[in-house]
Amino acid sequence: MSSLPGITRQDEEKRLQHTLEIAQRKVDANRQSVQALAEELHAMQEEFDENDKEAQTLWHNADARFKFVNQDLRRAEQARKKPYFGRIDFRDKKLKKDEVYYIGRSVIADNPAEPEVIDWRAPIASVYYDAALGDVSYSVKGEGKYDITLSRKRTYEIENDELKDFYDSDVVANDELLTKYLAKS
């Protein structure tokens, strides 16, 4: 476990609690939406006339929204349980700006433009799995290649809202470990 300045266990525990609060707000909002849509569907069913094509269309649209929000709730609950498993610290060579991204199974954000956690399938996340520390690049479809200097790759073990452990690595991620984590969540 690392104890470098500014990235202590205490710092990481504070970050985890902050991220869990954001994830919980998303879960709560989705639960409210699911409840409201369930009530709307119930009310529509009570007043539903099978011969009214417009009512059928409204009901099908509400049902599709309900299914989407319910699926989003399940994703939010999963993200709440284990918000992230990795972190990358890097310097964008073009912008000359230091960045830190936490990586999880899905995005966690109050503001989508500045997520607390990025999705593991995001192009920038590929350097967590595929690159060693130092000068590396990643590609974004339709945008091209970005050059960065990767300075840290950190892996986390989070269980029951608690940071169990974390460690820094300078090697390419073990695909078996990643597969195990993603299968568990």
Please report, for each region that a protein language model flagged, where it lies by residue.
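Extended, charged low-complexity regulatory segments
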Residues: 1-184
